[in-house]
Amino acid sequence: RIPNLELISLHKGEGEAQINGIDFDLTTLGHNFDAGQDAFLDTVAVMMNCDLIITSDTAVAHLAGAIGRQTWLVLKQIPYWVWMLDRTDSPWYPTMTLYRQKYRGDWVDVFDTIEQDLSSWLKQKEEVK
């Protein structure tokens, strides 16, 4: 648990049930979130009010990068080609930091690193206030 942190799920559609039973607080925006002809407009509006987006390789990652939001992207060991290999940055999205699996299927190191970086990032934000 990290103090002074609110987590908001931008997930929609299939797979929403995967977040049931998690053991931490998470704000969900409901099954009608960003539905219909204007898909992704609501997502952009929410993102513009977030200090940081943490996501996997989904449309949300590309959207966050395209609108210039600070984004931390978690990637499997062998990612989609656009993320290249052996980089922690993206030439397409300068506000994005890449967190990569070292071993296939092992997310422990990735999320341990994110937890440490997030704690440091939040501490820096508090010092600026």
Question: What feature does the model see in each segment?
Answer:
Residues 1-129:
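Catalytic machinery of carbohydrate-active enzymes
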